[in-house]
Structures are given as C-alpha cells and as structure tokens.
C-alpha cells in the first residue's frame, strides 16, 4: 500500500474535502458529489435516505487523517418523515452514529466506506428487537394466546 507522508497542512486539506462532502449531503446538493469518483453509491443512496429524513444533519465528532485516508466518526440527526426500508413515517427524531473512511487522491474522494448504525435506527423505529430485548409490538402476535411472532 502506498503510504506517502503528508504534512499537517495537507492533512487539513484532506479533512476539509471530507467536510465539504458532508456539508453537501446536509444541503442535499448531490450534484456536488459527482466530482468524486468514490461517491457513486452515495449519490445513488442518499436521495432515498434524505427523503426519509429531510432535515438530516451531520455532526463530525472526531476526524483523523493518515496518509491519503481520512477517518471520520459522526452523528446523524433527523426526523423520520418519509418511508424508510418499508417503515412508514413516524415523525420520530432519531440520532445514530456513522463511521466513514475516505481515500483522497488529487483532491477527490476516490474510495468511500460508510458504516452507519442502521440496526440501531430500526430498533428505535420499533422494527427489530434490541439485543436481549423484547420484540417490538409490531412484531408480536396480535393473539396473545398464539405462539408469538411468525417469520415468513
């Protein structure tokens, strides 16, 4: 793996590129993302996520740059106002974490990995049970005398 050394000034520049990417997401400016070849899947998925959470905002909690890679830990906050993964809007305010790894080459994001806590979101929406917790009401059998939830 090519591990070229960057100066602190260059680290700031690579972090700023990721910062501008996150700002463009918050502003729903998906066209600005198209200049980064590593963001193709993000450009495809984000309109779906932003339709479910139109007021979604990103707060960078921690960011580290090493070589040409920037690692970002961020918090996402938004109101569930549109369908998401088949779940109708709940108008519930949600917060979840996301970890990003971005590789920057010549000022462009060429590789982007995002790991969002979607299981946590689904638990908060009552779609899946928390580990060790009870099944959400919507998954429990309506007839309490039955065998419980069924799986298709």
Enumerate the language-model features and the residues they cover.
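C-terminal and inter-domain tail/linker signature
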Residues: 1-152
């Amino acid at each position: 793996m090519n591990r070229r050394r960057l100066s602190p000034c260059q680290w700031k520049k690579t972090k700023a590129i990721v910062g501008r990417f996150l700002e463009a997401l918050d502003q729903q400016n998906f066209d600005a993302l198209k200049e980064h070849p590593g963001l193709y899947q993000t450009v495809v998925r984000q309109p779906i996520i932003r339709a479910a959470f139109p007021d979604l905002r990103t707060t960078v909690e921690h960011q580290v740059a090493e070589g040409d890679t920037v690692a970002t830990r961020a918090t996402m906050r938004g109101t569930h106002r549109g369908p998401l993964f088949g779940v109708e809007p709940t108008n519930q305010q949600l917060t979840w974490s996301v970890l990003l790894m971005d590789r920057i080459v010549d000022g462009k994001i060429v590789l982007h990995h995002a790991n969002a806590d979607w299981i946590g979101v689904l638990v908060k929406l009552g779609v899946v049970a928390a580990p060790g917790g009870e099944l959400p009401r919507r998954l429990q059998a309506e007839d309490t005398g039955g065998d419980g939830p069924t799986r298709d």
